């Protein structure tokens, strides 16, 4: 998940001047990274993230925008927890923060998706919503056949809100339920690059695009190599089949075969892997490849006509599956 860390590190250092966008990012990050809890009758806002820089950014924005202090607890890696986690908690002013960020509605009920002011906000707010969601629970895989940018969502309503925000940014995203968990996925390479830029991870996008291009170049080279191999195999089989038919033609015609056709046929039999152009150079006197092809074609046609009249196997009978398999 190296690319994921690179994106989150860059986004956590991004300077955003728009107050509206900063509010949208805080709201989205809180919605996707944690939730609301009732502790001793009070609403507590929590968010769990995987980088200290994200926790510090969120704590600073909450204080700058809303004036509330947050406490960050560090959960060290141990047991089933593979990596260090950071839990930000606003306890004393949790309900006030939840109402101001739109996590609670006017009646004090939790908002299941994203608040209306974020969903219906500006393009900058839509970018900030994606930035907050990615900082909370996003991942970016290495470029390849199964490359994807994903965000794990707290519920289907939040997933649909994120899909809508992506649509406003001109990015195609899909909401999916995987093993009981809601996710929003972007798979198209161009769309992933565009979304990284929209969120503010331009430097990481350049790295990701470079790796993507290198992989595509390697894939193209492999396809061309496979194509060349297939062409060589087809050419080899065609040459073996042609030589077998010519041998049968010479058997059918015997002494009745014209000398100029016989010489072209013998060249084909003696040099089975040679191209028509090479056979032309080997002829005495030399011929063009079209002249060689024409003589071999007439030789086969003459032999097939005689075989039909006499009721014997024609030149095609010499081309057996075993013969082609060995080619």
Curated annotation (Swiss-Prot):
One of its GO terms (molecular function) is DNA binding. It comes from the Bacteria. Pfam families: HTH_WhiA (PF02650), LAGLIDADG_WhiA (PF14527), WhiA_N (PF10298). One of its GO terms (biological process) is regulation of sporulation. Keywords: Cell cycle, Cell division, DNA-binding. Residues 275-308 bind DNA. Involved in cell division and chromosome segregation. NCBIfam families: DNA_bind_WhiA. Belongs to the WhiA family. This is Probable cell division protein WhiA. It comes from Mycobacterium marinum (strain ATCC BAA-535 / M).
């Amino acid at each position: 998940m190296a690319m994921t860390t690179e994106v989150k590190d860059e986004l956590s250092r991004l300077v955003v001047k728009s107050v509206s966008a900063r509010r949208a990012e805080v709201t989205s990050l809180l919605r996707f990274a944690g939730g609301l809890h009732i502790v001793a009758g009070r609403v507590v806002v929590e968010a769990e993230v995987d980088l200290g820089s994200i926790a510090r950014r969120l704590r600073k924005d909450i204080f700058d925008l809303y004036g509330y202090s947050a406490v960050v607890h560090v959960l060290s890696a141990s047991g089933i927890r593979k990596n260090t986690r950071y839990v930000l908690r606003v306890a004393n002013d949790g309900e006030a923060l939840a109402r101001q960020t739109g996590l609670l509605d006017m009646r004090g009920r939790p908002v299941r998706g994203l608040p209306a002011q974020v969903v219906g906000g500006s393009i900058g707010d839509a970018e900030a919503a994606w930035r907050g969601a990615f900082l909370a629970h996003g991942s970016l895989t290495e470029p390849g056949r199964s490359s994807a940018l994903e965000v794990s969502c707290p519920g289907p309503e939040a997933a649909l809100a994120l899909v809508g925000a992506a649509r406003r940014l001109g990015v195609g995203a899909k909401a999916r339920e995987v093993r009981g968990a809601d996710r929003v996925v972007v798979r198209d390479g161009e769309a992933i690059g565009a979304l990284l830029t929209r969120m503010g991870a331009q430097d990481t996008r350049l790295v990701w695009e470079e790796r993507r291009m290198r992989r595509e170049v390697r894939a193209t080279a492999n396809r061309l190599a496979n194509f060349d191999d297939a062409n060589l195999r087809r050419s080899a089989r065609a040459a073996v089949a042609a030589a077998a038919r010519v041998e049968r033609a010479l058997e059918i015609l015997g002494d009745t075969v014209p000398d100029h056709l016989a010489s072209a046929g013998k060249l084909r039999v003696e040099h089975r892997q040679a191209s028509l152009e090479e056979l032309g150079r080997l002829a005495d006197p030399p011929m063009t490849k079209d002249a060689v092809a024409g003589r071999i074609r007439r030789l086969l046609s003459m032999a097939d006509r005689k075989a039909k009249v006499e009721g014997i196997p024609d030149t095609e009978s010499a081309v057996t599956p075993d013969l082609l398999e060995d080619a």
